[in-house]
């Protein structure tokens, strides 16, 4: 029996929502995350300090990268979207009966139209989100830069009040930043974003740069980091002594970062209306499925609140490398049998292997 906070679930998601995730959103997430991880890893494997600095970011990215690929595989194998499609066809027939049509008649059409309208946006937003998650130069110049602009516009008294918070933010931002790594990650992510998300429409400045560089941002990023104040903590601190708004607004990394952040936050009136229409239709779908008894799910999705779960703990699939009597825990023998030199998950220290061979367990 487990008491805990399970995060969120989407068991009521419609068929086309699942299709959108499997074909548009999650593949973009997986590729974007892998691009960030690969370029982080190039530097992490060469320097123990960098490895420590980026371990948390890498692990967090890898966690969701595995999750999204696992979701693609599982949903495809289980044919979940096809099952939902059949269920929704039955619901649509029920919804268009005379006694139900006024309330439920347009629910499926509204939902399907929404996903058709947002498939490309889902792909675009996931590529851009992974850029922003893995590339500090994608977010920091805009977030910190806007604070510096506000600082520059104030009088001396107000600046003195703002200074401690800004200094603290700068210390936090640059405490574990490794500039060569960040340059590589931003370059790779801009190349990927410009290549894969263009069908929906890129951030305007990025689209302008792509037209001039044929999709290779290597030189653009090199020029930007060479002349930007945001690649150096000392340069940002120096700005605080002589603050000028134009120093930030003309900074090349700020221009790119602000362009990306503006794009991910943008929402047109048409998109707002589509979101509102979908929200209403989805609530009606859930209500109608429960009323019609066409769905076996009779409980709400998890919403990050405390839940109780109970049942049996099943063992993992049998593995001849694991000598555990029940395959739900790991032994030293199992670890050694799974040992792979140089592998990120299954490498082991040479000293541990020696101690195990000598049966020296302390």
Please provide the spans of the model-predicted regions.
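Terminal presequence/propeptide segments associated with secretion/organelle targeting
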Residues: 1-362
């Amino acid at each position: 029996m487990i008491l805990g906070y399970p995060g969120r679930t989407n068991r009521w998601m419609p068929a086309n929502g699942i299709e959108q995730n499997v074909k548009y959103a999650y593949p973009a997430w997986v590729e974007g995350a892998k691009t960030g991880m690969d370029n982080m890893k190039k530097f992490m494997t060469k320097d123990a300090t960098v490895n420590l600095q980026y371990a948390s970011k890498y692990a967090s990215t890898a966690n969701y990268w595995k999750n999204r690929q696992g979701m693609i595989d599982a949903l495809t194998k289980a044919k979940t979207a096809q099952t939902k499609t059949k269920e929704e066809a039955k619901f649509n027939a029920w919804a268009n009966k005379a006694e139900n049509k006024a309330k439920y008649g347009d629910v499926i059409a509204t939902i399907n139209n929404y996903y058709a309208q947002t498939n490309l946006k889902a792909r675009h937003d996931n590529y851009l989100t992974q850029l922003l998650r893995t590339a500090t130069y994608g977010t920091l110049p805009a977030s910190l830069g806007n604070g510096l602009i506000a600082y520059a516009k104030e009088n001396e008294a107000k600046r003195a009040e703002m200074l401690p918070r800004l200094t603290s933010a700068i210390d936090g931002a640059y405490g574990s930043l490794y500039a060569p790594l960040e340059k590589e990650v931003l370059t790779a992510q801009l190349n990927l974003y410009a290549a894969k998300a263009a069908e929906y429409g890129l951030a305007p400045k990025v689209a302008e740069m792509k037209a001039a560089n044929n999709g290779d941002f290597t030189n653009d990023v090199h020029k930007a980091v060479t002349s930007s104040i945001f690649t150096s903590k000392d340069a940002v601190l120096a700005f605080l002594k002589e603050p000028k708004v134009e120093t930030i607004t003309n900074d090349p990394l700020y221009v790119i970062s602000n362009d990306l952040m503006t794009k991910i936050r943008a929402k047109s009136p048409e998109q707002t209306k589509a979101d509102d229409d979908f929200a209403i239709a989805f609530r009606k779908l859930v209500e109608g499925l429960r009323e019609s008894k066409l769905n076996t799910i009779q409980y709400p999705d998890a919403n990050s609140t405390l839940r109780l779960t109970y049942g049996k703990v099943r063992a993992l699939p049998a593995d001849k490398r694991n000598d555990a009597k029940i395959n739900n825990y790991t032994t030293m023998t199992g670890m050694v049998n799974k040992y792979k030199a140089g592998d990120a998950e299954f490498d082991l220290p040479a000293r541990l292997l020696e101690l195990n061979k000598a049966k020296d367990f302390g």
